[in-house]
Amino acid sequence: MLTRHLATIAALIAAVSGAAAQSAAATAEQHVAEGDSAYAAMNAPAALKHYQAALAIDSNFYPALWKASREAVSLGEFDTSKVSQKTFYSMGETYGRRAVAADPKDTNGWFVLARAIGRNSLTLGKKERVKFAKEIREDALTSLKYDSLNAGALHVMGRWNAEIMRLSGISRFFAENFLGGEIFHAASWDSAVFYMQKAVKLDPTRLVHHLDLGEIYYDRNKGNDRALAKQELEFVVNGKDTEYNDPNYKKEAAALLAKIK
């Protein structure tokens, strides 16, 4: 009899624990859904708070991890405080690393990690920036291994090629020695254009793809590149805002467009 009662109690405890776990998971999912709504409304601060609330319930909840990384980096991108910007970028990288640990075979974790490291590296001098180039490339390529049509990872690869090609003098020498000749010489303006054009084709309403493609055309400056740059930049200036940082992207596009006109 006692054994039967103990078994019944154990079963009840297991059922309650299971129900609690399901409830927590549902709540985490609810916070992610609310974060997604805030993201769609271009409210990055609110989106990040919801994703963080989900992680407070389940610290390894993959959708919340990679999306929290995305929003943290977006918040840091145009932050005028270098300290605050660094904090957001570090937060984005931390969430990205936790995301790939939680699900190493999904494309989005690797993409946001590459993006976070890439954005953080752009705050550094060119020589210091090179030290992160290898990991950025590896993470972006891993993302593309799991989804060759991930527009964000394609964007990172386009930007990676462009940043290597923008190096000059001692920075270029340092990059070749640090990355190794095979990786360094794999970078080209044509590859930068190829990857960014694919990102634009896959996600044509996203203004940042057009902005960076315009900047690549402007810097490559081959043939009718300046006319192509103008076309992309005008698209950004006249395009519809769909993301938190689009107003800032429009300002950058307008400033570069003024140099062409």
Set out the residue ranges of the language-model regions.
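Short coil/linker segments at helix-helix boundaries
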Residues: 37-46, 60, 70-105, 112-149, ...
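Bacterial N-terminal signal peptides
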Residues: 7-17
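Terminal, low-structured helical/coil segments at or just beyond the last alpha-helical repeat
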Residues: 22, 28-29, 167-180, 186, ...
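N-terminal leader/linker segments that initiate helical-solenoid repeat arrays
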Residues: 19-58, 62-77
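Positively charged n-region of N-terminal signal peptides that target proteins for export
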Residues: 1-5
